[in-house]
Regions:
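Short alpha-helical donor nucleotide-sugar binding micro-motif in glycosyltransferases
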Residues: 310-315
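A short, well-ordered alpha-helix in the C-terminal region of glycosyltransferases
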Residues: 384-399, 405-411
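Short hydrophobic beta-strand element within catalytic cores of glycosyltransferases
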Residues: 340-343
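Aromatic "clamp/platform" in nucleotide-sugar-dependent glycosyltransferases that forms part
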Residues: 323
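Carbohydrate-associated surface elements
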Residues: 187, 209
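Conserved acidic donor-binding segment of nucleotide-sugar-dependent glycosyltransferases
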Residues: 355-356, 360-367, 376-382
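Nucleotide-activated donor-binding/catalytic signature segment of Leloir-type glycosyltransferases, i.e.
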Residues: 268-277, 282-309
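Conserved donor-binding/catalytic core segment of Leloir-type glycosyltransferases
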Residues: 182, 232-252, 258-261
Length: 426
């Protein structure tokens, strides 16, 4: 019988955790045995190690606001699981000292490694720094993960952890031919294949699964009732924006959204502006205060997927001003809930939002164009928005639903299991 060790820092905190949990549930639904190994209840010692790592990584100064990780330490149950080498080990987000870079050489043969960001083939940064003032994002910059990290690097002060950690990862992984890596988007597939660490590796496209039975549209009656309960009228134009940390997370484009809304005020009348209501989820605080001159309701962190789906469905449009997304979970969930999306045409979002069909995409990171896209969405007729919304759900069903992703996932599991069995025979 196939047994999978599913390893992730968390199964509840963040998009990577939710994706990992969904992959585990796909296995369980098909009768595959799964051991979930995570740090959700790991205790004080694990927390202490993460604090040490957090302090040490701050010794590198590189002006990149993205999360940085050293991964000096391992969570003991993860390393202990390597004793069960006949089981399939599927690694998800292994940062926050879930698996140490010094234990990478112990990863069992024929394991699966799912990348939820760029950390594995970069230094200590989870994404290459994106310059919002560069219209093409980071694509035209000198990329260290392709050209190699240098000990002396302009712009880095203090300890150059990126150089050291990249060297350790490269030594441990670049020659491994038995690990299968999966990535959730074509953008990440292209970048991983160009990286020095993974350029010779077996890398597959495996998008995050979306539960279309949970993320689905409300009926017209349910939608009106939900909006009424939240204090919104039928004539209000609801714009939803979601991110861990809310609009304060720089990678999620809070600054770009603020600039876009400031532009939007000059593109519409005061009467139309008063109809627009913002809903922000994902931040810790709940409040009702203006954001860039627009009425705004911050609803906090939402843990119930059904409630989140209802929130998406109640909105007229979802805005995703992210600078970079490995996949675009919010975009896919919104579309599955029949809510069209406005976003920059960047990174993993390009796989999900099709300009003019499932939403509007604009050139990165043109906030005036973003404002115009919101305006265009606002002035679409109700039927035009509904048509776009239906196309969006159909696209998610056809490309990211459980049935589609599970078929590819089980094919990979069976392939890896066959290789393990062949190794046993040898």
């Amino acid at each position: 019988m196939v047994k999978v060790k599913l390893i992730s820092f968390s199964l509840s905190k963040g998009g990577a955790a939710i994706a990992a949990k969904k992959f585990g549930h796909l296995l369980l639904k098909d009768g595959v045995g799964v051991d979930f190994i995570n740090q959700d209840n790991s205790g004080r010692w694990s927390f202490f190690k993460r604090v040490i790592s957090f302090i040490l990584v701050k010794m590198q100064f590189d002006n990149n606001p993205i999360k940085h990780s050293l991964n000096f330490f391992s969570y003991k149950p993860v390393v202990d699981s390597f004793n069960y080498a006949n089981d399939i080990h599927h690694f998800h987000w292994i940062n926050n000292d879930t698996l140490s870079v010094f234990d990478f050489d112990k990863i069992p043969q024929n394991s699966i490694f799912t990348l939820h960001d760029e950390w594995l083939y970069c230094g200590v940064e989870h994404y290459v720094k994106v310059d919002p003032d560069c219209k093409n994002g980071s694509e035209e910059l000198d990329l260290d993960f392709i050209n190699g990290y240098k000990f002396f690097k302009k712009g880095i002060k203090g300890v150059n952890w990126s150089f050291y950690i990249w060297k350790i990862k490269k030594k441990a992984l670049s020659k491994r031919k038995d690990i299968v890596y999966t990535v959730p988007s074509l953008w990440m597939l292209d970048r991983a294949k160009k990286s020095q660490i993974l350029k010779d590796a077996d890398i597959r496209l495996l998008p995050n699964p979306i539960d279309i039975d949970v993320f689905k549209p409300l009926s017209a009656l349910e939608r009106n009732e939900f909006r009424y309960k939240m204090g919104f009228s039928e004539s209000d134009f609801l714009i939803i924006f979601g991110a861990i940390g809310g609009n304060k997370n720089p990678i999620k484009g809070g600054k770009q959204l603020e600039e876009s809304l400031n532009h939007l005020k000059s593109l519409i009348s005061d009467t139309d502006r008063q109809r627009i209501r913002l809903i922000i989820f994902g931040s810790a605080e709940k409040s009702s205060e203006a954001f860039s001159g627009f009425s705004c309701s911050r609803v906090g962190h939402i843990t119930d997927p059904t409630e989140l789906s209802a929130l998406y469905s109640a909105a007229d449009c979802a805005v995703i001003p992210s600078l970079v997304e490995s996949f675009g979970q919010v975009a896919a969930e919104a579309l599955a809930s029949e809510t069209p999306v406005v976003c920059f045409e960047t990174s993993g979002l390009k796989d999900i939002v099709i300009n003019g069909r499932t939403g509007f995409t604009v050139e990165p990171f043109d906030t005036y164009a973003f404002a115009n896209a919101i305006k265009d969405m606002f002035f679409l007729s109700t039927e035009e928005r509904k048509s776009m919304a239906r196309l969006g759900r159909n696209f998610v069903v056809a490309n990211f639903s459980y049935s589609i992703i599970s078929e590819n996932y089980f094919s990979l599991i069976n392939e890896v299991n066959s290789k393990k069995l062949n190794n046993l025979v040898k």
